[in-house]
Amino acid sequence: MSRNVDKSQTVLALYQEHKAESRRDYNRYKRPRVESVRDPAEAREWYKQTLREVGECTNRLYDPLLSEEQVRECNARVNQLIQESQRWSRHLRRFKQRQRPPVYGGVVVNGVRYIGRARELPEARKRPTAARQFTVKRAKYVDFSDNGDFSDNGDYRGTSERLRKAHGIAQQESVLVEPPTQQQMEEYLVERRKRQLLHQLNL
């Protein structure tokens, strides 16, 4: 009995998919392989459909009723859809058609994007501490000139002045100092060695 029901449901699904394909209903029938689509307009419709599904799955990832396993599965599905949408986007570029790249949001850890509640998963929190500190350090200290880049003539005084003011470092007066002579260096080294020996002997 169940076999007949499954068979009838399969036949019905195939029939509905065939009708949707004939009507070009991009919401109902199975997506073809990216490389098999030769019509730019059809490729664009499939691209839009993948983006809609990405949006639906992303909204679901904010559902507080989902279990941890459901969140993990839904996030994996979002990543699959994002990869598929990127393949459609590259395929459209072959037809000389460009589109604005979408902003997916979330965080990327080890090549996997975590969105919504998926950011609370244990694997999403495995971002190396050193990498976080490096990012914060760069964001805090790296600065650029007004035109967005350092000038070609090597003039970095303006940038240095802004950095000193930002971190409360007072500008010190420049003083020219004569470099020590060879004899002065030798006397200094002998004196330093003598102090080290006296310290070791507790004298």
From Swiss-Prot:
Protein name: Pre-mRNA-splicing factor ISY1
Phylogenetic classification of the source organism: Eukaryota, Fungi, Dikarya, Ascomycota, Saccharomycotina
Provenance organism: Candida glabrata (strain ATCC 2001 / BCRC 20586 / JCM 3761 / NBRC 0622 / NRRL Y-65 / CBS 138)
A Pfam cross-reference name: Isy1
Secreted is among the record's keywords: no
Any one Gene Ontology BP term: generation of catalytic spliceosome for second transesterification step
UniProt family annotation: Belongs to the ISY1 family.
Key word Nucleus present: yes
Compartments, record wording: Cytoplasm; Nucleus
Role played: Involved in pre-mRNA splicing.
One GO location term (cellular component): spliceosomal complex
Gene this chain is encoded by: ISY1
Subunit: Associated with the spliceosome.
UniProt-listed InterPro entries: Helix_hairpin_bin_sf (IPR029012), Isy1 (IPR009360), Isy1_sf (IPR037200)
Keywords: Cytoplasm, mRNA processing, mRNA splicing, Nucleus, Spliceosome
